[in-house]
């Protein structure tokens, strides 16, 4: 499996990705020893006969095992080579194979956090003694680690996924709607690293800072003590309470405050409920992507499409396509949007908020969405197999010219 010559910077201090383990195993019906490196989903098998003996005279399988044991993120490859007495070529071959199977991180990342620089390598081993005693640093390190379980497995992620999580600071999101789903989604996104989150009402006549009531309590962020407090204020207070990257109140200047917060312009809108014609037109003309979450009715809820103006099907494209397929059904669906807004059960609120948040993370990190040109209807009777409706740019719609 290991062959050819590789060039690797031996000053690097790589480490195996989170969740990657290794084990020496004997294959059935043979005495061939195998080292497996991986996590059960992806992995690498190395047999005794797949590695040429190294210059040290030790079996190459043992050298491979020794190399794996040394990949902890704080020892350079050159030092590892000296410690286990193997050639630079051997070390390079091992690293390149681990890179090929995306099982290794090659370097750490630097986070600029509340006027401080924090070195991070998906563990707190890199922290200085001062940082380790800093409560804010400890909190950040403890809370960012679970978030990296998503980003470290992105293709070509070499820093444990830290930079992807950190870049969410500059991805402002507007949530339209004041429902349980809206509040739960805002809380999850704040805890996932999105620093700039705002909510607004769906209708102009609705108070955007509508007070919290007992109906809003659904097992998430909202507590009985929040009743009577405006919903916009509650979402704003989330930054200090649960945000992964809270904004310090001690900023001496706006230089360290992300531009997305100094002047709020959303890069994505999440519309909980069908948007008004005015809001739809505003987002289209401003080239702002938006995701639609429809009403919960008959034990079902619809998510999508995620509209990227001029690039994917808009809600008018969907309307025109529905009109062609079934005018009567299209009329019924349109009328349903004029019904009074109703709250969803607590379990549905948490499920939908989590589902939306995972898709928003993928969209912010990678520019990908499971709801682009797609509407998914989730029924409580078959959550494992939602109905999928695929839409495309309609030839009679003018959104292509946006």
Question: Which stretches of residues belong to each language-model region?
Answer:
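Adenine nucleotide-associated cytosolic modules
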Residues: 1-402
């Amino acid at each position: 499996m290991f062959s050819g010559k590789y060039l690797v910077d031996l000053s690097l201090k790589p480490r195996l990705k989170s969740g990657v383990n290794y084990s020496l195993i004997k294959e059935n019906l043979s005495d061939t020893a195998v080292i497996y490196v991986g996590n059960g989903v992806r992995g690498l098998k190395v047999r005794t006969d797949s590695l040429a003996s190294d210059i040290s005279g030790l079996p190459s399988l043992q050298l491979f095992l020794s190399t794996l044991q040394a990949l902890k993120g704080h020892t350079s490859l050159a030092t590892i080579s000296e410690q286990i007495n193997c050639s630079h070529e051997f070390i390079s071959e091992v690293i390149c194979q681990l890179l090929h199977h995306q099982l290794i991180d090659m370097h750490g990342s630097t986070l600029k956090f509340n006027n401080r620089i924090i070195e991070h390598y998906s563990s707190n081993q890199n922290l200085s003694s001062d940082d380790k005693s800093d409560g804010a640093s400890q909190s950040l390190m403890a809370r960012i680690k679970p978030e990296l379980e998503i980003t470290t497995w992105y293709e070509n992620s070499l820093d444990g996924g830290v930079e992807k999580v950190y870049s969410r600071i500059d991805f402002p999101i507007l949530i339209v709607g004041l429902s349980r789903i809206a509040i739960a989604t805002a809380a999850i996104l704040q805890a996932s690293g999105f620093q700039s989150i705002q909510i607004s009402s769906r209708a102009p006549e609705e108070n955007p800072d509508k007070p919290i009531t007992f109906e809003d309590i659904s097992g998430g962020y909202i507590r009985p003590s929040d009743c009577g407090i405006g919903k916009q204020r509650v979402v704003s207070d989330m930054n200090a309470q649960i945000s992964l990257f809270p904004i310090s109140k001690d900023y001496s200047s706006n230089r360290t405050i992300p531009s997305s917060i100094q002047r709020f312009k959303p890069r994505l809108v999440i519309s909980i409920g069908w948007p008004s014609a005015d809001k739809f037109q505003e987002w289209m003309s401003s080239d702002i992507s938006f995701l639609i979450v429809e009403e919960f009715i008959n034990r079902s809820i619809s998510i999508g499409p995620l509209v990227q103006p001029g690039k994917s099907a808009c809600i008018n494209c969907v309307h025109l396509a529905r009109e062609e397929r079934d005018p009567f059904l299209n009329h019924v669906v349109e009328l349903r949007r004029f019904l009074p807004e109703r709250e969803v059960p607590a379990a549905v609120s948490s499920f939908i908020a989590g589902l939306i948040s995972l898709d928003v993370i993928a969209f912010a990190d990678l520019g990908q969405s499971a709801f682009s040109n797609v509407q998914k209807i989730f029924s409580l009777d078959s959550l494992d197999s939602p109905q999928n409706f695929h839409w495309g740019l309609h030839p009679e719609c003018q959104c292509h010219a946006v």
